[in-house]
């Protein structure tokens, strides 16, 4: 898989263009500021006088309504939550799409699953930093960047690569390295990673470990330190050095115990469950479920959030994070 760097990309394709960033959350703020600081012409489209309106103005942006931004821009970069994109697109963006314009995303969800169907003659691309927005902005200001992905779903103008690669360069992604992929691959792997490992799998593993120790009579504080707090140390080692060097950096006791016991935790049944989760993503079952959840105003999600906040590990963790100076007293 080819990796592109700064010397491979040029900003030329965007020199006479206007980029409208729709949304001003973590990614919207970071990407719009980085592109603006790279000399690109950026406007920000937001709900009139919404919560982000003044924030974007304070950051020096030319702020306008979503409709005004969509009409003015050559490239419309949609960075609002997945579940809101189709509705906003249909009502406020689609009427202003003309042949030769570019529709851009940082996650392929709505294009891949067909919730947004652009008209003919419009480029459809994706540029996705592989990092939270704050890191995208901080590393750019430090003179570097974070890795990213680019995709081209529709190349109506025969220069979609030049456009999306220029956006990646403007955001600072090519300073670290950019990989070209597809909307399908980006969407399905991203959802799988979130559900099976990064957000779903890890939190359930931590919770099970914490509860096992507490139920065996150990102090909740000790259980938290050993199953949650110290996880960051191990993840940082893996992130920086890989598995092999992580094992080199921990004690022999930890290495032997981990290597000989890990397959009893993540079993063949666990991998079979992962495969089923991936199938649900691939065949659209998860997407249908998520759409139905939105239709009932996220009732199930809100209930799960409430229950998660009531867990003992949350209560113990809040106290220990304050003790460690990680979380300020309210």
UniProtKB/Swiss-Prot annotation:
Binding site for Mg(2+) 2: 190, 226, 230
GO molecular function: ketol-acid reductoisomerase activity; magnesium ion binding; NADP binding
Organism: Methanococcus maripaludis (strain C7 / ATCC BAA-1331)
Cofactor note: Binds 2 magnesium ions per subunit.
Ranges of residues in domain KARI N-terminal Rossmann: 1-181
Pathway: Amino-acid biosynthesis; L-isoleucine biosynthesis; L-isoleucine from 2-oxobutanoate: step 2/4; Amino-acid biosynthesis; L-valine biosynthesis; L-valine from pyruvate: step 2/4
Domain KARI C-terminal knotted residues, every copy: 182-327
Binding site for Mg(2+) 1: 190, 194
Matches recorded under Pfam families: KARI_C, KARI_N
Enzyme Commission code(s) on record: 1.1.1.86
PANTHER family: KETOL-ACID REDUCTOISOMERASE, MITOCHONDRIAL
Listed name of the protein: Ketol-acid reductoisomerase (NADP(+))
UniProt similarity note: Belongs to the ketol-acid reductoisomerase family.
Gene3D superfamilies: 6.10.240.10, NAD(P)-binding Rossmann-like Domain (3.40.50.720)
Entry binding sites for substrate: 251
UniProt binding sites for NADP(+): 24-27, 47, 52, 82-85, 133
BP GO terms, sorted: isoleucine biosynthetic process; L-valine biosynthetic process
Function according to Swiss-Prot or TrEMBL: Involved in the biosynthesis of branched-chain amino acids (BCAA). Catalyzes an alkyl-migration followed by a ketol-acid reduction of (S)-2-acetolactate (S2AL) to yield (R)-2,3-dihydroxy-isovalerate. In the isomerase reaction, S2AL is rearranged via a Mg-dependent methyl migration to produce 3-hydroxy-3-methyl-2-ketobutyrate (HMKB). In the reductase reaction, this 2-ketoacid undergoes a metal-dependent reduction by NADPH to yield (R)-2,3-dihydroxy-isovalerate.
Cofactor: Mg(2+)
């Amino acid at each position: 898989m080819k990796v592109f760097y700064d010397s491979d990309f040029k900003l030329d394709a965007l020199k006479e263009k206007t980029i409208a960033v729709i949304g001003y959350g973590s990614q919207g703020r970071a990407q719009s500021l980085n592109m603006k600081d790279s000399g690109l012409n950026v406007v920000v489209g937001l709900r009139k006088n919404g919560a982000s309106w003044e924030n974007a103005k304070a950051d020096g942006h030319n702020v306008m309504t979503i409709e005004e931004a969509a009409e003015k821009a050559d490239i419309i970069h949609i960075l609002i939550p997945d579940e809101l994109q189709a509705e906003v697109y249909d009502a406020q963006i689609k009427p202003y799409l003309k042949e030769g314009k570019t529709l851009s995303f940082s996650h392929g969800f709505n294009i891949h699953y067909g919730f947004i169907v652009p008209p003919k003659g419009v480029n459809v691309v994706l540029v996705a930093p592989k990092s939270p927005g704050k890191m995208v902005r901080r590393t750019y200001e430090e003179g570097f960047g974070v890795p990213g992905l680019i995709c081209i779903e529709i190349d109506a103008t025969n220069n979609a690569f030049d456009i999306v690669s220029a956006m990646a360069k403007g955001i600072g992604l090519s300073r670290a390295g950019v990989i070209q992929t597809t909307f399908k691959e980006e969407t399905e792997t991203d959802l799988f990673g979130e559900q099976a490992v990064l957000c779903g799998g890890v939190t359930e593993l931590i919770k099970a470990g914490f509860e096992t120790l507490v139920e065996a009579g150990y102090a909740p504080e000790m259980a938290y330190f050993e199953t949650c707090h110290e996880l960051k140390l191990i993840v940082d080692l893996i992130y920086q050095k890989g598995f092999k060097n992580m094992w080199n950096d921990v004690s022999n006791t930890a290495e032997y115990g981990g290597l000989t016991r890990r397959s009893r935790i993540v079993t063949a049944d666990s991998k079979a469950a992962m495969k089923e989760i991936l199938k649900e993503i691939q065949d659209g079952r998860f997407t249908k479920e998520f759409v139905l959840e939105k239709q009932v105003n996220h009732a199930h999600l809100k209930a799960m959030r409430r229950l998660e906040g009531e867990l003992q590990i949350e209560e113990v963790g809040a106290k220990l994070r304050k003790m460690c100076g990680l979380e300020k007293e309210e």
